[in-house]
Structure formats: structure tokens, C-alpha cells
A protein has these predicted regions:
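Extreme N-terminal starter segment of soluble prokaryotic enzymes
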Residues: 1-3
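Glycine-rich Rossmann-fold phosphate-binding loop(s) that bind the pyrophosphate
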Residues: 8-9
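N-terminal Rossmann-fold NAD(P) dinucleotide-binding loop
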Residues: 12-13
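Conserved N-terminal Rossmann-fold NAD(P) cofactor-binding segment
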Residues: 33-71, 300-308
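Rossmann-like NAD(P)-binding element
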Residues: 51-113
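Rossmann-like NAD(P)(H) cofactor-binding subdomain of soluble oxidoreductases
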Residues: 87-153
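C-terminal substrate-binding/catalytic lobe of Rossmann-fold NAD(P)-dependent dehydrogenases
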Residues: 132-139, 148-308
């Protein structure tokens, strides 16, 4: 199975590493516009294979989309990263042009590929390629909720003093600091609601810390995070190529689900060989419904800035 990763920056390189280390793809093509950059990253990773023993072949190329031909999955990470004080929405003007050009080239050589969108604002970028290229909704997956959910589960586990593996939780709605919706009502520790362990004030703090997770890292690092995002992408690719049918929150095109139409936003999805195989409609309480629809409205407003 062949995977292409567009953009050899921190997120692109880290997800390539995770994919290779797990040996579920036979080949990963890492593409970048900077001369020699992807080739260097690929060489470094392939030299690591002598230590780690993985068999995945990694090929680096400079803007040569012909080398990506017949990819099963294409990951798009290219675009301007967030800078300190910059919102994801402010990225839209620059990144919409980048994503459109990349997608056109990708589809020329891999017309049946499943596309995982990582470029921010991810809900809007996912919607853009849905509308511009008219692909089946199952083939465009926005990677936002997987990352937000990882941050939510980490914060819960930290507060509970338990392993992250003991904690289940989910974040839906938009992949934005203000619009994401961590679902406290459905978060559990070994099947028991976290509200049995933590008071309301602590839970509210966890929600706010989750929402600010990306911005906090941008402030500390001077750029966007890459380890957790790369791992989130790799988990999606793994679920597709191995047909795992995992339920992972992703930005998906809604056509009536949750009472919404014509919008890409974070919802729990079953991810398998065909991409998004099913959108799971959760039972939300009234407060969660109100916040979810408000998040949808905010994304629609950002989408209004797109030029097709």
C-alpha cells in the first residue's frame, strides 16, 4: 500500500516516521517544494530503518507529483503554519490557494486516493476541496478531532492520575480554539463517568486547557506542534490501510447528520478501507447541541471567505 505525504515539514516528517515505524505501508512518498528538503528527510528516515528495522520504503521528491502516482492515501500538510498570536482562521487566504493547487496535482496522478487534510483551518480546507473537486464525501478526511481528542484524554488522565489508556473521551465540532467541543458527558475512566472523580470546576478547567492546547504549544515552540499531530495522522492512515474500522473524530461533510447540511466539521467517524465509512450520530444534551451548532455557524462564516 502506498502513501504520499505532501509537505516535509515537522508534521509531514513526523507522520512519515510513525507510518514507517509501524510497517503498515509498503511505500511512503514525501514531497516538498523546497529543493532537496524531502530527499534529505527521507534519507535520514531510511538510515533510521537500519536501527529500528522497519521495512517501509521512504522516497523524498521535490515537487515531482508523478512519483506519487497510484497512492492509496494522500496526506496534505503543506501550508503556512500558525505563528504566535495567529488564529487558524487567519491562515485561510494563503492556505486555500496552496491546498487547491496541491489537490489538483494529487488527483492528476492518484484520482482514487483518500485524502487526509491537515492544513489549517482544517474544517474549511476540507470543505474547499469537497466543493472544488466534487469528490465522494468518504474520501476527504480532516484531521482535527483526532488531535483535540488526544489532548483532551491527556488532560483528563493527568487530572485523574491514571494512564491515558484508562481514559476515553472525545472532542467534536470545529478544530478551533473557541469552537471545539470536548464532551465531558461522554468521558469515562474505565467505563465510569469522569464526573464521578472530578468536580465541575476541575472539569471546566480541563475543557479550557484542551481548547487552548494548540495555542499553548505555539506560544512555547514558536510554531505549531508536530509530534501529536503526526501521530494522529498516522492513526488515520493505519485505520484506512489496515481496514481497522476505528471510531476517530474527523472533519467530515455533513448531509443532514446532526441537523446540519453542506458543512465539514468534526464528528465521530468509522474509518476503514473506504475512508469515512460511517458518521456516528451521538446523543447530545441541550448545552452540547447549542455549542455544536454555534461552532458550525462560525465555520460557515469562515467558509464564506473562500473563492471557488
Amino acid at each position: 500500500m502506498k502513501v504520499t505525504v505532501i509537505g516535509a515539514g515537522a508534521v509531514g516528517a513526523s507522520c512519515t516516521e510513525y507510518i514507517a515505524m509501524r510497517n503498515f505501508a509498503s511505500e511512503v512518498v514525501l514531497l516538498d517544494i523546497k529543493e532537496g528538503f524531502a530527499e534529505g528527510k527521507a534519507m535520514d528516515l531510511m538510515q533510521m530503518s537500519a536501527v529500528e528495522g522497519f521495512e517501509t520504503r521512504i522516497i523524498g521528491v521535490t515537487n515531482n507529483y508523478a512519483k506519487t502516482e497510484n497512492s492509496n492515501v494522500v496526506v496534505i500538510t503543506s501550508g503556512m503554519p500558525r505563528r504566535p498570536g495567529m488564529s487558524r482562521e487567519e491562515l485561510i487566504g494563503v492556505n486555500a490557494d496552496i491546498v487547491s493547487g496541491v489537490t489538483e496535482n494529487v488527483l492528476k496522478y492518484s484520482p482514487n486516493a483518500i485524502i487526509i487534510m491537515v492544513t489549517n483551518p482544517v474544517d474549511t480546507m476540507s470543505y474547499l476541496i469537497h466543493k472544488k473537486f466534487q469528490l465522494p464525501k468518504n474520501r476527504i478526511i480532516g484531521m482535527g478531532g483526532a488531535l483535540d481528542t488526544a489532548r483532551f484524554r491527556y488532560r483528563l488522565a493527568e487530572a485523574l492520575g491514571c494512564p491515558v489508556s484508562d481514559v476515553d473521551g472525545m472532542v467534536i465540532a470545529s478544530h478551533t480554539d473557541t469552537g471545539m467541543l470536548p464532551l465531558i458527558s461522554k468521558a469515562t475512566r474505565n467505563g465510569i463517568c469522569v464526573a464521578e472523580f472530578l468536580n465541575k470546576e476541575k472539569l471546566n478547567n480541563i475543557v479550557e486547557e484542551t481548547k487552548l492546547g494548540g495555542a499553548t504549544l505555539v506560544k512555547l515552540l514558536g510554531t505549531s506542534a508536530w509530534y501529536a499531530p503526526g501521530a494522529g495522522v498516522a492513526a488515520l492512515v493505519h485505520s484506512i490501510l489496515s481496514d481497522q474500522k476505528k471510531m476517530i473524530p474527523c472533519s467530515a461533510l455533513l448531509e443532514g447528520e446532526y441537523g446540519e447540511q453542506d458543512i465539514s466539521i468534526g464528528v465521530p467517524c468509522i474509518i476503514g478501507r473506504n475512508g469515512i465509512e460511517k458518521i456516528m450520530e451521538l446523543s447530545l444534551n441541550e448545552d452540547e447541541k447549542e455549542k455544536f451548532h454555534a461552532s458550525v455557524d462560525a465555520v460557515r462564516k469562515v467558509n464564506g471567505e473562500l473563492k471557488f
